[in-house]
């Protein structure tokens, strides 16, 4: 039942992709995900494995970039079908897969159906997951994440064929090319392993051995992708000169968990809400249910795993503050973190953990002695909401988004009130009515997440990427044999961003001005490019 309802929710939220053949068009999807997928598609159709990209940065490694997903088997979908809708459906399929996997993982850990349903919905539709639809590699890794955790945990318990499945799933995730998401996956695996090892007796060594086998075999399975990547990383400018840390959460970034438009830049410049302090994700909003249920998951719970998980979430939130949180700088002094330029990505750990903690909270909602804990939790979340509202009016905000944030505040208070009332009712109602109220919490959370920031993943007609552009054709055909185009950065930046309603214009303009990787769409050789890793020789040029 949950699988069918989740599928309907994903289809309903993205009906223009499913029924009208549209594709995504915001930011990195248009200048990174789509062009790279097109390069892969054209190479494979020509019977070639794209080891090298001749069109960008005067020649650049393609397969070794890792996030090009050259060796990720599901990318064959984009080769067999029209790329625009196929790539969008690829992303939506992984979004759905991740939510379904989180449902089964939460059900395994909590043995509670409504709690597992809430976890699945939160994981599927939270702000980071919806934003990740513009990064095919990230959404693919997130979609496999709960399945890897579930398979590896089952594998170290039972061994046998399940262990082989864990190896295959883990190796498959390694081919997605999303390093941070893969690291967070295995942080969860090791947390769960440590928790079980504490309680295990003679089986402890066997569990550790089986987990080690999965790690080793998965790495061996993906070695054809990992070895070129690490070679490129070792010779890239990121390690050669030290990565520049950008996009981290400021000290008041916690307010965005309760007021998604807090400290934001408006629609007109970026086509979507962007936080002034970080540009990686448009939102990291989780809804109100996880925070209202958090106290129930942590207090008077004999199982200490939720508390360990919550402690790791706190550390992740501090890491997400980057240099301003001090902890990131201290760890960086011991173990260089240049490979992660965006500390805000540590919020992904909270995005994974909070749905599971919410599921534990639902399980313990009706247990005796928890009434006081629930009311204290509601009061604390209410105080944080009030503080966020006060800061919204008294802390200096970017002028572009202040009016929008003030307009959104009453709507947020209504959603908070509706969620809090539903949680209280679920605590007091008995019998069949209680189950209905619990699924009401799931429905409220899903609706809240889907509407908390409209147009998180806007779509455009697939033809926006396919229309023949005379200017691009001239550059591609009437050039000097060894020549390359080199647009100014100012011209590029002026074309990449703009209001949502202008996306059908922005994408052709982006192609005309060769913004980032748009040159791959029209096969125009370019001096520059938009990649995670760059060779030092290109940087010097």
Predicted features and spans:
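Membrane-interface helix-loop junctions at the exits of transmembrane helices
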Residues: 11-19, 44, 77-81, 85, ...
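Periplasmic/ER-lumenal interhelical loops and adjacent helix-loop junctions
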Residues: 27, 31-50, 214-297, 332, ...
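Transmembrane alpha-helices of multi-pass, membrane-embedded glycan-processing enzymes
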Residues: 41, 78-81, 90-101, 141-144, ...
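Soluble catalytic regions of membrane-associated enzymes that act on cell-envelope
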Residues: 405-407, 436-541
């Amino acid at each position: 039942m949950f699988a069918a309802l989740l599928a309907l929710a994903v289809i309903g939220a993205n009906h223009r992709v499913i029924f009208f053949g549209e594709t995504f068009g915001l930011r990195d999807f248009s200048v990174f995900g789509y062009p790279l997928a097109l390069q892969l598609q054209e190479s494979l159709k020509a019977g070639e494995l794209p080891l090298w990209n001749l069109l960008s940065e005067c020649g650049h490694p393609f397969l070794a970039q890792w996030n090009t997903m050259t060796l990720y088997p599901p990318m064959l979908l984009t080769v067999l079908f029209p790329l625009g809708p196929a790539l969008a459906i690829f992303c939506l399929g992984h979004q759905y897969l991740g939510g379904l996997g989180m449902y089964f993982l939460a059900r395994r850990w909590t043995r509670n159906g409504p709690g597992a349903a809430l976890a699945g919905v939160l994981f599927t539709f939270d702000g980071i997951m919806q934003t990740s639809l513009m990064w095919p590699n990230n959404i693919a890794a997130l979609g496999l994440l709960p399945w890897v955790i579930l398979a590896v945990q089952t594998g170290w318990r039972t061994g046998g064929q399940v262990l082989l499945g864990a190896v295959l799933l883990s190796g498959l995730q390694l081919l997605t090319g999303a390093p941070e998401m893969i690291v967070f996956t295995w942080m969860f695996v090791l947390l769960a392993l440590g928790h079980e090892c504490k309680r295990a007796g003679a089986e402890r060594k066997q569990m550790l051995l089986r987990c080690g086998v999965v790690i080793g075999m998965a790495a061996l399975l993906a070695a054809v992708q990992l070895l070129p990547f690490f070679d490129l990383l070792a010779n890239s400018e990121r390690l050669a000169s030290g990565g520049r840390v950008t996009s981290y959460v400021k000290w008041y970034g916690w307010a965005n968990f309760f007021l998604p438009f807090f400290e934001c830049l408006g629609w007109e410049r970026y086509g979507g809400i962007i936080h002034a302090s970080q540009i990686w994700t448009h939102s990291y909003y989780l809804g109100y249910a996880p925070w209202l249920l958090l106290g129930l998951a942590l207090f008077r719970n004999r199982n200490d795993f939720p508390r360990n998980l919550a402690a790791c979430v706190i550390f992740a939130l501090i890491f997400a503050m980057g240099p301003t949180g001090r902890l990131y700088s201290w760890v960086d002094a011991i173990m260089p973190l240049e490979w992660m330029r965006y500390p805000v990505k540590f919020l992904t750990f909270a995005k994974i953990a909070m749905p599971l903690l919410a599921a534990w909270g639902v399980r313990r909602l009706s247990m005796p002695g928890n009434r006081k804990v629930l009311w204290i939790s509601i009061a604390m979340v209410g105080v944080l909401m009030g503080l966020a509202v006060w800061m919204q009016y008294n802390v200096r905000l970017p002028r572009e988004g202040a009016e929008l944030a003030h307009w959104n505040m009453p709507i947020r208070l209504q959603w908070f009130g509706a969620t809090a009332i539903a949680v209280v009712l679920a605590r007091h109602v008995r019998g069949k009515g209680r189950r209905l109220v619990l699924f009401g919490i799931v429905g409220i959370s899903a609706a809240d997440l889907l509407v908390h920031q409209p147009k998180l993943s806007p779509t455009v007609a697939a033809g926006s990427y396919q229309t023949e552009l005379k200017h691009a054709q001239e550059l591609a055909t009437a050039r000097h044999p060894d020549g390359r185009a080199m647009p100014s950065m100012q011209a590029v930046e002026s074309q990449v961003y703009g209001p949502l309603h202008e996306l059908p214009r922005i994408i052709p303009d982006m192609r005309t001005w060769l913004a980032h990787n748009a040159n791959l769409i029209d096969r125009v050789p370019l001096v520059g490019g938009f990649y995670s890793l760059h060779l030092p020789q290109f940087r010097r040029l």
